[in-house]
Each structure stands twice: as C-alpha cells, then as structure tokens.
Amino acid sequence: MTPDQVIVALDVPDLPKAIALVDRLPGVGFWKVGLELFVGAGPVILAELKDRGKRIFLDLKFHDIPNTMLGACLSASRYEVDLLTLHATAGSQALTLAAQAMAPLPHPPKLLAITLLTSIGDRQLREELQQPLAVDDYVNAMARLARNAGIDGAVCSPQEVAKLRQTCGPEFLLVTPGVRPLWSAPGDQQRVMIPAQAIAAGANYVVIGRPITADPSPEAAWERLCQDLAV
C-alpha cells in the first residue's frame, strides 16, 4: 500500500481552515471535500485544491428523484473533480441517468454509490431502518444495483470490501472510509479496520480524516501513517 491510496478527509468548517490544513500537508495528494466544507466554503475550495495540483473526492452524497440527481451530477461535473458520491438507495433509474450523463463528458468524475453509512450497524439497520437483511448482504445488494446501473464504484466499510470485490469484479472502484490506524480512536464509525488490511481486502482507496486532521500535529500524524504503510 502507498500514500497515493489514502484520501484525507478535509473535515473543517470553512475555507481558511481548509487551506491552512492543505498547506501544512503538502505530501497529501488526494483530499475529500464533504458537506460541511462545501456548504461552508462553496466551490472555491475545489478551485484552491486544483490550483495546488490535488485530486478531489467530492463527497456530497446526492439522494433525490432521478431528474434532480441528474442535474446535480451534471453541475458537479463542471468542477472536474475525480470522485463524486450519490446514494444507491435513490434507485436504478436515478443511478442509470447519472451514469449515462457522465459518459460523453470530457472530464467526468467517477461516480461512487453510497451503499450504507459506516456509522450504521446491524441493530440500526434492522430496528430503525426496518431492513431485514444483515449489513453485509444489504451492502452487497446496493453495490450490485449500482454496478448494474453503470456506476463506477461504491463506498463501503472495509468489512464488506472482499465480498464486493468478488461480486462486482476487478474494475469496480471500492473506496472505504471506515479505516483508522491502530494508534487512533474509532470515533463514531462502527465498522472499522486498519488501512493496510482494507487495501489487502480489495479496496482501491481508503479515507482517513480525524486521525490526521484532528491531531495536534497533523504533519506528524501523516508521517506516522506513511511509516505504517511502508511496513
């Protein structure tokens, strides 16, 4: 595993904090911009990242009726980001429309389907969402739905990676946010694994946020992570 397979979550509320963090970590080449930062800073953060030669995972998790999802994906594609998320539970029509719309674009983002948030475990899936399937079966079903609709990949926890790699094949991108180094706390994610294990299981990229960005010394935390990956 190499640092190029690590996407660092830029989970800060505004542009000045985001730029300060990016400039403190010049070795990070791939950043995730989520709802908090995109709403707080607007698309200018994407321009700032591109000006610095960074790759961008725009994690806005679109979930709406098919035509609205289509329009949102087309609007987001103008930013020329690398990865863009949408919920698989929007259904096959919405997913297919989005995938077909990206195909003719000169610089389309890879579309990733959200299968199930990594904060949700079996009990919540069963009792709160009233879903009788176990987490791994539900995630597998959502990933198959996305693949069959022409979506490029999926976001899933590391526990589901190996099964999805078998089910969806080698070309299907798998990005997992539920990873944390051994030296960090698990936070609010329930389905976690260390980065190297997730890659070995078949993930293309891992997403790591607070273990790096919330550390008193993000530079030292990033260096420690890179040392872990080299072992």
From Swiss-Prot:
Complex formation: Homodimer.
Family: Belongs to the OMP decarboxylase family. Type 1 subfamily.
Residues at the catalytic site: K61
Name of the featured protein: Orotidine 5'-phosphate decarboxylase
CDD domains: OMP_decarboxylase_like
Function: Catalyzes the decarboxylation of orotidine 5'-monophosphate (OMP) to uridine 5'-monophosphate (UMP).
Claim: Lyase is one of the keywords in the record: yes
GO molecular function, one term: orotidine-5'-phosphate decarboxylase activity
Pfam families per UniProt: OMPdecase
GO biological process annotation, one example: 'de novo' UMP biosynthetic process
Keywords in alphabetical order: Decarboxylase, Lyase, Pyrimidine biosynthesis
Binding residues for substrate: 11, 32, 59-68, 118, 180, 189, 209-210
Species, as recorded: Synechocystis sp. (strain ATCC 27184 / PCC 6803 / Kazusa)
Pathway(s) of this molecule: Pyrimidine metabolism; UMP biosynthesis via de novo pathway; UMP from orotate: step 2/2
The reaction(s) this protein catalyses: orotidine 5'-phosphate + H(+) = UMP + CO2
Entries under InterPro entries matching the protein: Aldolase_TIM (IPR013785), OMPdecase (IPR014732), OMPdecase_AS (IPR018089), OMPdecase_bac (IPR047596), OMPdeCOase_dom (IPR001754), RibuloseP-bd_barrel (IPR011060)
UniProt keyword Lipoprotein present: no
Enzyme class: lyase
